[in-house]
Amino acid sequence: MTAVSAMSWWQVIVLAVVQGLTEFLPVSSSGHLAIVSRILFTGDAGASFTAVSQLGTEVAVLVYFGRDIVRILHAWCRGLTVTLHRTADYWLGWYVIIGTIPICILGLVCKDEIRSGIRPLWVVATALVAFSGVIAFAEYVGRQNRCIEQLNWRDALVVGVAQTLALIPGVSRSGSTISAGLFLGLDRELAARFGFLLAIPAVFASGLFSIPDAFHPITEGMSATGAQLLVATVIAFVVGLVAVSWLLRFLVQHNLYWFVGYRIVVGVGVLILLAVKTVAAT
């Protein structure tokens, strides 16, 4: 027997804004949704609502990178038939495909665990703090001397494997892929761009697959109506479009230590709230 309650419109709007703001920042959108849900609404919206609302932020990626995506697709299609047309964009298309394979395999193997997964706040808080060390180390050792023409299939596979860490709430998809890119010598902006392109197939597949569960959660959580899911997706799109534009400009001039500090403050703060039993872990 599952304990399911309906989401309020206020909850939908707040969580959609949180989703849009945090999806592209290396701070974990799923972790923030779990934290905000528990602190403000005393209940987790659930992984399915997160996955569906992510469709809005991924549409934001499609809009922001629209010209790049069309150019890559065009180059990839031409390169399939004409060897002379195998440009850097052609190979980038293949690298996105290769980098998507790890999370597709893990998603299929662990689909039941992902669908029914509960997000304990102690896991979220611990991951926020622990993975901030990885991000800081990547920023410290990253040479940032490789350009897009120097990418290869091994790089794509490494970043793709790093993307699977995003299944752990509190890690962050962008945090894991940008860190992997920095370890490989890519500059911050290129690492972020490649990570965002890599996320498109996986997030769209996850979001579409999770739509039925968002209406009827299979574990304890909150259910949403079709209108609420639509509004949440639109809000996440608008806020996400602003966020991705801001982040890429920010990364040109600033390092990731700002986000490292933020993650530690939030993670430690949540652990303190759990220790004094101000909020429940689940």
UniProtKB/Swiss-Prot annotation:
Disulfide cysteine pairs (residue numbers): none
GO molecular function, one term: undecaprenyl-diphosphatase activity
More details: Bacitracin is thought to be involved in the inhibition of peptidoglycan synthesis by sequestering undecaprenyl diphosphate, thereby reducing the pool of lipid carrier available.
Role description: Catalyzes the dephosphorylation of undecaprenyl diphosphate (UPP). Confers resistance to bacitracin.
Topology with respect to the bilayer: Multi-pass membrane protein
GO cellular component terms, A-Z: plasma membrane
Main subcellular location of this protein, as a coarse class: membrane
Similarity section: Belongs to the UppP family.
GO biological process, one term: regulation of cell shape
PANTHER family: UNDECAPRENYL-DIPHOSPHATASE
Catalysed reaction equations from the record: di-trans,octa-cis-undecaprenyl diphosphate + H2O = di-trans,octa-cis-undecaprenyl phosphate + phosphate + H(+)
The species this protein was found in: Mycobacterium leprae (strain TN)
EC number: 3.6.1.27
Protein name from the UniProt record: Undecaprenyl-diphosphatase
Keyword Transferase: no
One Pfam family named in its UniProt record: BacA
Gene that encodes it: uppP
